[in-house]
Every structure is written in C-alpha cells, then in structure tokens.
Regions:
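C-terminal and inter-domain tail/linker signature
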Residues: 1-128
Length: 128
C-alpha cells in the first residue's frame, strides 16, 4: 500500500481507539494479532478509562507506519502493579506498526515511562 494509505489507516485506528470503537479498531488488525491486541486494549482502558491519543508526528512507508503521539488520561485502575492514583497523565509514546494488505501484523510501542511514573508519584521528579 502507499505511504498515504498507510497514514490514513493509522489515523483511522487512533480515531477508533479514541471513540472506544474496539471492533472498528480490531478490523484493521490481522486476525493472528487480534486477541493479543484486545487484551492490551482491555489493560489500557482499565488503567486509563478516559485515555486519548493525539498524533504529534506520523510517517509511513510501503509496509509500515510510525506514530509519535501524546497519551492523556486519568489513572483510575491498576497499571503495571500500580494501584489507581486518580492522577492525570500526559506522556509521549511511539508506535511502529508493520502492515500487510492494510492490516497490522506486528506492533511495537515505546512510551516515556519516566514521565508517566513521575506523574503517578512512583518516582521522584527528575530521577531519569
């Protein structure tokens, strides 16, 4: 697929996630990855039920898309063993998605956990 088409796929994915339209989101994920992705989304929504992603930058190639985003939400559920703090969070993430026939076949994400953990009060400010 073209770079433009892959960028549109990623934008639709993020819009579906922000709208909590999980079926729409998963429709663009290869069947072999859907169950794992559904579990990941369940964990995310349990921890940050009001989570929203905002695209900062997006780049694509013939079979991939990379999205740098800001993730915002309120920590209202367990996350990585951290009980709900009810604190707002605002941190950056970058996701690399490999695509085949318009569907995600592999996803890797990296988040600014130092900032996230500071905001949750798990670590002292400036520790990293």
């Amino acid at each position: 697929m073209s770079e433009r088409e892959n960028i549109q796929i990623a934008k639709k994915q993020i819009a579906a996630l922000n709208a909590r339209n999980i079926d729409e989101y998963l429709s663009r994920v290869d069947e072999s990855c859907r169950e794992g992705m559904r579990k990941s989304l369940d964990i995310l929504f349990a921890a940050l039920p009001d989570v929203r992603l905002e695209i900062e930058q997006i780049r694509a190639g013939e079979n991939f898309v990379v999205v740098h985003s800001t993730i915002k939400g309120t920590h209202k559920g367990n996350f990585a063993g951290i009980a709900a703090t009810n604190k707002p969070v605002n941190f950056h993430a970058c996701n690399f998605v490999e695509l085949r026939n318009g569907k995600a076949i592999r996803m890797r994400g990296y988040a600014d956990k130092a900032t996230l953990f500071e905001q949750l009060g798990v670590v002292s400010p400036g520790w990293a």
